[in-house]
Amino acid sequence: MLAVNFTAFFYNLNISNLTRQVNKMKMDELEKVMIVEGKSDKEKIESVLNEPMRIICTNGTISQLRLEELADELYDKDVYILVDADESGEKLRKQLKREFNEACHLHVDRAYKEVAAAPRHHIASVLLRANLNVHTIFLERKSRGV
């Protein structure tokens, strides 16, 4: 009985790892990549975006080594950068601009300061200006506060 459960556990573990690897491969194949600061920024963008895009979180900071690795990894991708409209966000933007000089820089209104704090209709308009597809519900209900 223990051997069967042990085997089933490792089978599920291997399937789970395989699924993660396949999903990572699919994400690596995407042509568009967005770099953001935090997980809540990523979640906000994912809720508005209506097209496949890999979203990379820097967690507010990035080492020079990781930045160079990303530059090598993303050299043939369309890179978008959306960071907070605060001092740390602008510092990160400058760092990213050096490595990704052809990236499309997106900006939230300074009134919101943070990507995660901006309303979805505002994020939708920012993404739309960069020719990214968004869920139209966030454009249609702009006046109703969605």
From Swiss-Prot:
Family matches, as InterPro entries: TOPRIM_dom, TOPRIM_RNase_M5-like
Example of a GO biological process term: rRNA processing
Molecular functions per Gene Ontology: ribonuclease M5 activity
Domain Toprim: 31-119
Matching SMART domains: TOPRIM
Protein name, entry field: Uncharacterized protein YusF
Gene this protein is translated from: yusF
